[in-house]
Amino acid sequence: MRVVILGSGVVGVASAWYLNQAGHEVTVIDREPGAALETSAANAGQISPGYAAPWAAPGVPLKAIKWMFQRHAPLAVRLDGTQFQLKWMWQMLRNCDTSHYMENKGRMVRLAEYSRDCLKALRAETNIQYEGRQGGTLQLFRTEQQYENATRDIAVLEDAGVPYQLLESSRLAEVEPALAEVAHKLTGGLQLPNDETGDCQLFTQNLARMAEQAGVKFRFNTPVDQLLCDGEQIYGVKCGDEVIKADAYVMAFGSYSTAMLKGIVDIPVYPLKGYSLTIPIAQEDGAPVSTILDETYKIAITRFDNRIRVGGMAEIVGFNTELLQPRRETLEMVVRDLYPRGGHVEQATFWTGLRPMTPDGTPVVGRTRFKNLWLNTGHGTLGWTMACGSGQLLSDLLSGRTPAIPYEDLSVARYSRGFTPSRPGHLHGAHS
């Protein structure tokens, strides 16, 4: 079957790889000159299934009000004047109760755990390189309340069979030796030994290279204008004066998927702006071993070979990609606080990207009401964590095979009432 994939981020390229391996003739289209040049370029580097959890959580609405007055707040909201933003935030608020949180976290962990298994198999099969480490993740708590709240997430981990260790502050250095210097600032941590890390952009670009060698075609520097439909079928992708045709089409444009599907399929995917710093390592014994997640500031600090990646925060501000100095200062503050000798912070590279987020935090993967239009988008802050599993799942569904995990609750059908966002005029390009 001829399949066109829209988007060359980590989710789009993973989809291309697995569809190619299933025997399909795959073409990937993107406006950028190469793979992983937008949202997949410089994310936090975590592959953390156990920490897969929606931003829509009990207590978040009240916390959001408090965060409005804090300099280093993990979440910020600025109205962009669109009805879609208001609807999306309202839907998110409706998911902030305990029942929805547990349901959403459960299916996110399910997909993320499966995805890590798929990545492990891919690594064994291809020996793909991406500065990957299998050293686990350590969530750090600064208050007793955070430490006590961890028991709620532990219940989900136990249900999913995810190994964990709840550590008092005196034991944190057993996992991350450099934290011995700052343990007095912390109340404890939750360690997930099976989690991994790696450079998402490096992985995506190497996988794209392997996919191309296997026969996948990449059409870079090719902005997409619109999908062309007739009845319940998509019959082409309009790119300037050219119409590219296939038997099936996969939407993996991240935050830009919603606008590109306007008038065809309503999906509630909204951009969640995040930031990162990439820092050269200064002192080896003062740097992280794997990944830590600061629960207070919602910031991850991840170890690559000779670099530290510091990423996090969430801004609900539309398609704004301005680099804000106060956000840089927050990232610098956290990494200096926890790893004061770890990196040359003054040499850091500052970056921002738009994560495609659904109100319930779970991606939309599967077929739409159009028989040949498929979705693989809305992974939020977990695109890297969920990419391989989502790609394999999509390939199985499109190929008519029974997937290895339950998938019905990942369909866009769970938003049956639909969203009707206005399509911004500047979004006629594609997104990776």
UniProtKB/Swiss-Prot annotation:
Regulation of activity: Is activated by the HinT protein. Is inhibited by D-cycloserine.
Membrane topology qualifier: Peripheral membrane protein
Cited InterPro entries: DadA, FAD-dep_OxRdtase, FAD/NAD-bd_sf
Cofactor (UniProt): FAD
GO molecular function: D-amino-acid dehydrogenase activity; protein homodimerization activity
Induction details: By D-alanine. Is regulated by catabolite repression.
Keyword Zinc found: no
Deleted gene: phenotype: Loss of the ability to utilize both D- and L-stereoisomers of alanine as sole sources of carbon, nitrogen and energy for growth. A double dtd-dadA deletion mutant has a pronounced growth defect in the presence of D-tyrosine.
GO cellular component: cytoplasm; plasma membrane
Biological processes, Gene Ontology terms: D-alanine catabolic process; L-alanine oxidation to pyruvate via D-alanine
Residue sites binding FAD per the record: 3-17
HAMAP family (alphabetical): DadA
Descriptive protein name: D-amino acid dehydrogenase
Species of the source: Escherichia coli (strain K12)
Gene: dadA
